[in-house]
C-alpha cells in the first residue's frame, strides 16, 4: 500500500485555502457588527449631562429602541442596534433637548482596530 505524499503544490493550495477562509471570516465579522453609538455632551465645560431617564422617555415616546445608556466622563453614550436607529434618535434628541448639547455619532471600532490605533499613535523609540 502506497502512502500519499504531500507535495509542494498540495501545501500551497492548502495554505491558500486557509488564507481565503481566514480572510472571509474576518470580513464577515466586520460586516455583521452593526452597533451604533450616539454621544451627548454639554458645550460648556462643567455643565451637567442630560438625565438618562429623560433621554429614555423622549426616545420611547418616538418608538426608538436602544441597547444602553451609559455615562462616561462628561458624556452620555447611547448604544443602538443599527445606524438607522441612531440617526432617528439624533433627529429626535436635536428637537427635544435644550440648546447647549452636542449630539454626535461615535465610531464603534472593533478591538483589532483599537489595538492598531494604539500602536500607531504610541511613540516608538528605536535604537
Swiss-Prot record:
<dbReference type="GO" id="GO:0019901">
    <property type="term" value="F:protein kinase binding"/>
</dbReference>
<keyword id="KW-0472">Membrane</keyword>
<protein>
    <recommendedName>
        <fullName>Modulator protein MzrA</fullName>
    </recommendedName>
</protein>
<comment type="subunit">
    <text>Interacts with EnvZ.</text>
</comment>
<keyword id="KW-1003">Cell membrane</keyword>
<dbReference type="InterPro" id="IPR027398">
    <property type="entry name" value="SecD-TM"/>
</dbReference>
<comment type="similarity">
    <text>Belongs to the MzrA family.</text>
</comment>
<keyword id="KW-0997">Cell inner membrane</keyword>
<feature type="transmembrane region" description="Helical">
    <location>
        <begin position="12"/>
        <end position="31"/>
    </location>
</feature>
<feature type="topological domain" description="Cytoplasmic">
    <location>
        <begin position="1"/>
        <end position="11"/>
    </location>
</feature>
<keyword id="KW-0812">Transmembrane</keyword>
<dbReference type="InterPro" id="IPR026574">
    <property type="entry name" value="Modulator_MzrA"/>
</dbReference>
<comment type="function">
    <text>Modulates the activity of the EnvZ/OmpR two-component regulatory system, probably by directly modulating EnvZ enzymatic activity and increasing stability of phosphorylated OmpR.</text>
</comment>
<dbReference type="GO" id="GO:0005886">
    <property type="term" value="C:plasma membrane"/>
</dbReference>
<dbReference type="Pfam" id="PF13721">
    <property type="entry name" value="SecD-TM1"/>
</dbReference>
<keyword id="KW-1133">Transmembrane helix</keyword>
<feature type="topological domain" description="Periplasmic">
    <location>
        <begin position="32"/>
        <end position="127"/>
    </location>
</feature>
Amino acid at each position: 500500500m502506497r502512502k500519499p505524499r504531500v507535495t509542494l503544490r498540495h501545501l500551497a493550495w492548502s495554505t491558500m485555502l486557509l488564507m481565503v477562509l481566514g480572510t472571509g471570516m474576518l470580513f464577515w465579522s466586520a460586516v455583521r457588527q452593526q452597533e451604533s453609538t450616539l454621544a451627548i455632551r454639554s458645550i460648556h465645560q462643567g455643565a451637567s449631562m442630560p438625565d438618562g431617564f429623560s433621554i429614555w422617555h423622549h426616545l420611547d415616546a418616538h418608538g426608538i429602541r436602544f441597547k444602553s445608556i451609559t455615562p462616561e466622563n462628561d458624556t452620555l453614550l447611547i448604544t443602538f442596534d443599527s445606524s438607522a436607529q441612531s440617526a432617528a434618535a439624533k433627529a429626535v434628541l436635536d428637537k427635544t433637548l435644550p440648546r447647549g448639547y452636542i449630539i454626535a455619532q461615535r465610531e464603534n471600532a472593533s478591538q483589532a482596530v483599537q489595538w492598531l490605533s494604539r500602536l500607531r499613535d504610541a511613540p516608538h523609540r528605536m535604537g
